[in-house]
């Protein structure tokens, strides 16, 4: 029994179940405490995200040496191609399926969550994108100048971050996820809004699994390795993403899952997973495209033209690379495209945000799980091009 409770996937599932049940029975007075605890834990996790990014990407780049610039370019290209192809697949499914769906536009109202008892703001030392850019620039500059002092410092900083992950973030995650689902259950989002859009959500989730299968099959074919040896370890990361709705907040668990795989090079994991958590949002892109087409049909009576959707998908792939890996980050970053390319009005934008929020957790889980496939591609690329293996980073013990 003790071994079972020490298992991270079990603790995450238990947190989800307990959170949903308690959200149905807790009064407003107790929910004030839950909302406050969830807020504080979320603040702490969010604060640590830039540290995790810097602690893994920068030292990983220094260990890649002269190959750093080339690998960074390869990573960005495959992340963009994955997102755009997922968007195009979603658009094709939209043209084929949406005209035949009977979608109810009436959405039940939600209860309002009580305010937090007190606010404890823990602002990040920098934004996620700033941390990503800083990591890349410092890592590349340290490599170009052969700065041993900087490289050693980054290695020590990585060890510090690993301890923060293993001793603070991961033990706290089940409680954070339980509080999150308690809030959703109390609001009524789980019991009322989800059934209203169950058709399109199920279709989108099926699209997630189809695209993940495509990614892992392509990664396996290119690398010559068994993709199941990566995917089989991603259960905890998938569940964490469902609970946090954030690729960035799931980063700690995703790193540990990927490092358990025997077919992934550890240097590629330390370089690729934190990078892809911020630039590879294939699940969110796939979801947004299908939902935009659905809302266009509901509110405006027609689907966008093929030319419009091709432009939207191509631009959305670029916006996804720059979108923050936080809840709703993709749709928030692309609001300009939704209003400028698809010509959505305020009603369309509001409905898009509401529906997207219902399944944001599963889109995020697709993003995170897809990162493993792209890291397998990076591993294959490194081995095919004779890039030296720097497998000397220890993983946190969960």
Sequence positions of predicted segments:
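Signature of multi-pass transmembrane helix bundles
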Residues: 2-27, 39-48, 70-229, 388-398
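Juxtamembrane helix-boundary/capping and inter-helix hinge elements in multi-pass membrane proteins
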Residues: 27, 61-70, 99, 143-148, ...
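Alpha-helical membrane segments and immediately flanking helix-loop junctions
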Residues: 233-289, 317-331, 358, 362-377
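Membrane-water interface of transmembrane alpha-helices in multipass transporters/channels
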Residues: 33, 69, 73, 190-198, ...
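Membrane-interface alpha-helices at helix entry/exit sites of multi-pass transporters
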Residues: 69-75, 166-170, 261-277, 303-307, ...
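Transmembrane alpha-helical segments and their short flanking loops
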Residues: 102-103, 290-398
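Small-residue-enriched core segments of transmembrane alpha-helices in multipass membrane transport
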Residues: 75-84, 158-161, 197-214, 233-241, ...
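Short amphipathic alpha-helical coupling elements at transmembrane boundaries
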Residues: 35-46, 152-167, 232-240, 256-263, ...
């Amino acid at each position: 029994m003790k071994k079972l409770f020490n298992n991270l996937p079990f603790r995450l599932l238990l947190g989800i179940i307990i959170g949903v049940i308690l959200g149905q029975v807790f009064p407003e007075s107790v929910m004030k405490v839950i909302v406050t605890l969830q807020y504080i834990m979320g603040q702490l996790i969010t604060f640590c995200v830039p540290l995790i990014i810097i602690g893994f990407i920068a030292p990983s780049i220094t260990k890649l040496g002269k190959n750093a610039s080339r690998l960074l370019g390869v990573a960005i290209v495959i992340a963009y191609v994955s997102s755009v192809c997922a968007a195009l697949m979603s658009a094709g499914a939209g043209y084929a399926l949406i005209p035949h769906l009977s979608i109810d536009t009436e959405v039940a109202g939600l209860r309002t969550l009580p305010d937090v008892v007190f606010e404890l703001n823990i602002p990040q030392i920098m934004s996620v994108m700033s941390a990503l850019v800083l990591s890349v620039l410092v890592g590349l500059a340290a490599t170009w100048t052969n700065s041993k002092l900087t490289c050693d410092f980054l290695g020590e900083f990585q060890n510090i971050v690993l301890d923060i992950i293993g001793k603070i973030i991961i033990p706290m995650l089940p409680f954070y996820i339980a509080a999150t689902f308690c809030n959703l259950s109390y609001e009524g989002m789980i019991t009322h809004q989800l059934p209203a859009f169950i058709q399109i959500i199920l279709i989108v989730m099926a699209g997630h699994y189809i695209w993940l299968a495509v990614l892992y099959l392509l990664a396996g074919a290119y690398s010559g390795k068994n993709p199941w040896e990566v995917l089989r370890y991603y259960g905890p990361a998938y569940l964490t993403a469902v609970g946090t709705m954030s690729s960035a907040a799931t980063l700690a668990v995703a790193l540990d899952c990927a490092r358990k795989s025997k077919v992934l090079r550890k240097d590629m994991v330390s370089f690729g997973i934190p990078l892809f958590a911020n630039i590879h949002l294939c699940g969110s892109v796939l979801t947004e495209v299908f939902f935009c087409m659905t809302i266009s049909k509901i509110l405006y009576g027609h689907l966008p033209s093929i030319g419009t959707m091709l432009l939207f998908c191509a631009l959305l792939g670029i916006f996804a690379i720059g979108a923050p890996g936080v809840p709703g980050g993709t749709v928030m970053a692309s609001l300009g495209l939704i209003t400028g390319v698809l010509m959505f009005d305020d009603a369309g934008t509001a409905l898009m945000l509401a529906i997207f929020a219902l399944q944001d957790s599963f889109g995020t889980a697709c993003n995170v799980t897809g990162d493993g496939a792209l890291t397998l591609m990076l591993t294959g690329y490194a081995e095919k091009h004779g890039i030296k293996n720097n497998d000397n980073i220890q993983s946190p013990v969960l």
